[in-house]
């Protein structure tokens, strides 16, 4: 089977990318520490045997480290250089500024530290006020990246899906589009209540207790055609590069150490 055939077989699949469940669990734990939530009981199941009453809230150690790291990395604007093409350099710098990337990078770095990375979706419309649009997407919630099972650097298909409020319809809707190197696929929006009541949507996000649109059988393709770019316009940026699909968050390996600091104090 060719890579194009493998990618085509993934269109509108109800299967999830390998490792996504693991990533969601890791990100949920990291977000709990960052939001200074009370500790979920399962955090202690492997070593906390004594009963000390109500579980304590997370101290702001992890949050402070991540905030400082993000500001250190992207507190100063990046400079884009295209030595062999000054016109392209001027255009990219203008698009970078109009997409407010200088301010957004700090927030993206914080999100990547918690989720293990971030995805950037690029769109081009020469008639738009900002022809080159850069959209940042959560690897946990808003994008599904399917890779060649034999090469974790070869992306076969990217699915972008997220909820939004439709003011005309007066309800929350779900948006979906998919990309392979050969095809661009768009779907009709789906109302949130359709996902909630569908028997095919029984699976829920373990971390967020909400319906998973990946399992919904009612998605209908509204348009499907050739990819005008010849490549998938999604960049997967890992927070820390590792030899797997998703990389790692800044403090994933240290949260259990922080537990041992928090509990004696609280």
What are these regions (language model features)?
Residues 142-146, 167-174, 219:
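A short, polar/proline- and glycine-enriched secondary-structure boundary/capping micro-motif
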Residues 1-155, 163-165:
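Extended, helix-rich architectural segments
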Residues 169-185:
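A recognition module on extended beta-rich or small alphabeta surfaces enriched in W/G with H and D/E
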Residues 209-266:
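Extended, charged amphipathic alpha-helical segments
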Residues 182, 189-201, 205-216:
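Extended, non-transmembrane interaction/recognition domains
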Residues 69, 108, 112-113, 176-177, ...:
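Generic hydrophobic, helix-prone segments enriched in Leu/Val/Ile
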């Amino acid at each position: 089977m060719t890579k194009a055939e493998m990618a085509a077989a993934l269109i509108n699949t109800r299967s999830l990318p390998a490792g996504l469940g693991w990533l969601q669990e890791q990100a949920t734990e990291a977000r709990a520490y960052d939001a200074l939530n009370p500790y979920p009981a399962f955090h202690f199941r492997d070593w906390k045997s004594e009963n000390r009453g109500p579980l304590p809230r997370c101290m702001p150690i992890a949050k402070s480290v991540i905030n400082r790291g993000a500001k250190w990395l992207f507190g100063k604007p990046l400079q884009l250089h295209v030595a062999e093409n000054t016109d392209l350099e001027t255009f990219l710098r203008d698009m970078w500024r109009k997409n407010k990337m200088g301010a957004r990078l700090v927030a993206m770095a914080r999100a990547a530290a918690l989720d293990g990375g971030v995805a950037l979706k690029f769109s081009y419309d020469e008639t738009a006020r900002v022809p080159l649009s850069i959209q940042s997407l959560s690897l946990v919630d808003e994008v599904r990246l399917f890779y060649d099972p034999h090469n974790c650097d070869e992306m076969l298909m990217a699915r972008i899906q997220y909820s939004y409020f439709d003011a005309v319809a007066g309800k929350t809707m779900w948006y979906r589009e998919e990309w392979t190197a050969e095809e661009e696929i768009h779907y009709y929006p789906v109302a949130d209540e359709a996902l909630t009541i569908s028997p095919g949507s029984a699976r829920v996000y373990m971390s967020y207790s909400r319906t998973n649109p990946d399992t919904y059988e009612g998605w209908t393709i509204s348009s499907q055609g050739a990819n005008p770019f010849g490549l998938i316009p999604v960049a997967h940026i890992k927070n820390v590069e590792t030899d797997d699909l998703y990389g790692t968050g800044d403090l994933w390996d240290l949260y259990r150490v922080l537990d041992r600091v928090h509990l004696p104090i609280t």
